[in-house]
């Protein structure tokens, strides 16, 4: 007696995960790297271009009253939060998932950025920044740089401190500051040469480059 073989169908899997993440399967473009890519990375897309930094830099250079770094930093804070929520986080892939925005982590990342102003300020002073004479302005520069790095800080915390990929964003901001220092000693006696105005602009330009092109590197 011959026995009939049952047709082998596709196995069905049921997931009981309570993770609020969105799976990449069927939700992301097929041209994403599947092999050899880091466990956490940012997709190559125009979505990560920080258009708000272009507008803010133009306002700071052309229309701000006396190059007000304090006001520029306060304007930057909500812009960076919206940029993270609407542009950077949706383009960031954690393993095989895009995680929804973690509101508690937004606050934690903000506090982390404030705490990072202290080592950032010490680093700026070690590179030759005025310390006692313009301590408030040096701290404002450090705060501005840390706010610029806010999306990268959030992503590092959200990926269990996988700093390897996101360090490029911090480096681009630091390099922008470093290059812009060349404008200060020039004998032009212009208002925009005062500390720390050139470095604020340089940090913004470095952040523009980083958030636009670091996903390609």
Curated annotation (Swiss-Prot):
What cellular-component terms does GO give this entry? endoplasmic reticulum membrane
Read off the InterPro entries from this record. Answer: GPI_biosynthesis_protein_Pig-F
Is Endoplasmic reticulum among the key words of this record?
Answer: yes
Which UniProt keywords are listed? Endoplasmic reticulum, GPI-anchor biosynthesis, Membrane, Transmembrane, Transmembrane helix
User: Does the keyword Heme feature in the UniProt annotation?
Assistant: no
What stretches pass through the bilayer? 45-61, 74-94, 111-131, 138-158, 169-189, 195-215
Task: Give compartment(s).
Answer: Endoplasmic reticulum membrane
> Which GO BP terms sit in this record?
GPI anchor biosynthetic process
What's a Pfam family in this record? PIG-F
Q: How does it sit in the membrane?
A: Multi-pass membrane protein
Pathway(s) the chain acts in:
Glycolipid biosynthesis; glycosylphosphatidylinositol-anchor biosynthesis
One GO MF term on file is: mannose-ethanolamine phosphotransferase activity
Hey, which family's this protein in?
A: Belongs to the PIGF family.
What function is annotated for this protein? Answer: Acts in the GPI biosynthetic pathway between GlcNAc-PI synthesis and GPI transfer to protein.
Q: What is this protein called?
A: Glycosylphosphatidylinositol anchor biosynthesis protein 11
Q: What is the species listed in this Swiss-Prot or TrEMBL entry?
A: Eremothecium gossypii (strain ATCC 10895 / CBS 109.51 / FGSC 9923 / NRRL Y-1056) (Yeast)
């Amino acid at each position: 007696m011959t026995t009939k073989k049952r047709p082998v169908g596709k196995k069905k899997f049921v997931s009981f995960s309570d993770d609020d993440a969105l799976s990449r399967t069927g939700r992301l473009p097929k041209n994403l790297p599947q092999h050899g890519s880091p466990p956490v990375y940012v997709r190559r897309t125009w979505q990560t271009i920080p258009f708000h930094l272009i507008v803010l830099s133009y306002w700071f250079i052309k229309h701000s009253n006396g190059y007000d770094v304090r006001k520029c930093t306060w304007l930057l804070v909500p812009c960076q939060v919206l940029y993270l929520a609407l542009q950077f986080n949706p383009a960031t892939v954690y393993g095989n998932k895009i995680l929804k925005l973690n509101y508690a982590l937004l606050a934690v990342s903000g506090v982390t950025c404030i705490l990072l102003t202290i080592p950032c300020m010490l680093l700026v002073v070690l590179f030759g920044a005025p310390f006692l004479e313009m301590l408030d302005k040096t701290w404002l520069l450090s705060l501005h740089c840390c706010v610029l790095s806010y999306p990268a800080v959030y992503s590092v915390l959200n990926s269990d401190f996988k700093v390897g990929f996101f360090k490029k964003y911090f480096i681009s901001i630091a390099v922008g500051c470093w290059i812009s220092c060349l404008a200060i000693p020039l004998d032009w006696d212009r208002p925009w040469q005062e500390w720390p105005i050139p470095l604020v602009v340089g940090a913004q330009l470095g952040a523009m480059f980083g958030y636009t092109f670091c996903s390609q590197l």
